[in-house]
């Protein structure tokens, strides 16, 4: 009995330590976003003596917040919509059509997840540049290419839990394959869609590397690209940078907490097979 209590206390202590380690970056960012530059360098971990709300005003002005926010939002929303639709349609075709080629194509999508982006980024950007496609539309197309592998993998697994008898009954009633997918199968895949959306929002919204390679126009830059300019080679405005990071992180945090309950439901639903 005593051994069980010791294990329980150790697990609780370990959980607290891991939670503090996970929260500490957010604490440092939030606390230092309200400090002056001198106060930040004096003691990074201390609470601010006074709340410097001007940091947020200056950061928003320097970021050109409305433009950068709208660019990031447009790219993220369109990328997720296209990834979800393309991945679910592809997975539906591969899972329902029983051919050897379907298995091979599915394996190609699965193996593609193992290819590191860094190994293809230079030739990819070079090819897109030849077609003058280094734009926001080109960036969305790239996100589709890199995000569809995970999407197909998740949807394919979810479709295994949906009986083919639904498809057969709909075909007998005169439904086309597209109507079966759109009106019957896709709504049943909502848990997987929510899971994929949460993962992709956290990836695309916070992505710096790919937009830095693709987007050249100042008016098309995303929030991560604009925040980078607070940490240039010769000037590092850490307090303004922390305020900018807080502004950029806040929408994702709000979305995650709003979608958390549905995400847990999605994970549970995805674990239950017919």
Swiss-Prot record:
Organism equals Thermoanaerobacterium thermosulfurigenes
Residue span(s) of domain ABC transmembrane type-1? 69-259
Q: Which PANTHER family match?
A: ABC TRANSPORTER PERMEASE PROTEIN MG189-RELATED-RELATED, SN-GLYCEROL-3-PHOSPHATE TRANSPORT SYSTEM PERMEASE PROTEIN UGPE
**Record's InterPro entries?**
MetI-like, MetI-like_sf
Top-level taxon of the source organism: Bacteria
CC terms in the record's Gene Ontology section: plasma membrane
Identify this protein by name: Probable starch degradation products transport system permease protein AmyC
Q: What is its main location?
A: membrane
Write out the transmembrane intervals. 11-31, 73-93, 103-123, 139-159, 184-204, 238-258
Provide the topology term for how it sits in the membrane: Multi-pass membrane protein
Its gene?
amyC
Primary role: Probably part of a binding-protein-dependent transport system starch degradation products. Probably responsible for the translocation of the substrate across the membrane.
Q: Which family does it belong to?
A: Belongs to the binding-protein-dependent transport system permease family. MalFG subfamily.
Gene Ontology terms describing biological process = transmembrane transport
Q: Which UniProt keywords apply?
A: Cell membrane, Membrane, Transmembrane, Transmembrane helix, Transport
Localization in the cell: Cell membrane
